[in-house]
């Protein structure tokens, strides 16, 4: 008779995301994962595979949550400019702990993308998806006369992806809220 799981896989995966986010892939041990996830070694392997497979699942889970948040943000805000403003200024107001963790996907890029083709592919696809979300929002803004049609929506989308990645990297090094707000202000001026 098959044993029932004594843990909730979704909660365990969320715990794994937090461990990898805090420690990075290389500095995360299986013992730490098992403790934080509340799972036994065999249950971890049976449910998620090895450490690398779990890491990939954690990256995808984090990525999917970010994509959903961004889509929801642009669907709920009154204007595209308001959406970008909320995204950038909310990022500048994150706590010191949030800034020190940075972005899990950016950390994965710096830590592993040159050594792991599958992770590099996942990260490139993530960037393209975010650029697509931003470009769609920018095109809506152009269609409604909010943003000049003289600006290339795809180029602006790439600019905002790069701005966010830069803000995440800077915030991790130096929790200077005012500097991050200045960057957000300059970036938003590109929508004028």
Residue ranges and their predicted role:
Residues 57, 71-101, 153-157:
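Hydrophobic alpha-helical connector segments
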Residues 60-66:
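Short, basic, alpha-helical segments at the C-terminal edge of helix-turn-helix-like DNA-binding modules
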């Amino acid at each position: 008779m098959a044993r029932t799981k004594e843990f909730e896989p979704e909660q365990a995966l969320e715990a794994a995301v937090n461990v990898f986010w805090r420690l990075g892939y290389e500095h995360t041990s299986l013992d730490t994962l098992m403790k934080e996830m509340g799972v036994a070694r065999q249950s971890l392997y049976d449910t998620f595979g090895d450490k690398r497979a779990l890491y990939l699942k954690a990256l995808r889970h984090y990525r999917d949550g970010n994509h959903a948040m961004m889509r929801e943000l642009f669907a709920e805000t009154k204007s595209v400019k308001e959406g970008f403003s909320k995204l950038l200024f909310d990022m500048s107001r994150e706590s010191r702990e949030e800034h020190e963790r940075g972005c899990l996907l950016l950390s994965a890029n710096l830590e592993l993308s040159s050594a792991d083709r599958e992770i590099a592919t996942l990260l490139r696809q993530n960037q393209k998806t975010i650029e697509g979300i931003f470009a769609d929002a920018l095109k809506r803004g152009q269609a409604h006369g909010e943003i000049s049609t003289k600006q290339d929506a795809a180029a602006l989308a790439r600019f905002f992806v790069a701005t966010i990645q830069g803000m995440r990297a800077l915030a991790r090094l130096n929790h200077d809220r005012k500097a991050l707000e200045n960057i957000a202000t300059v970036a938003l001026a590109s929508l004028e």
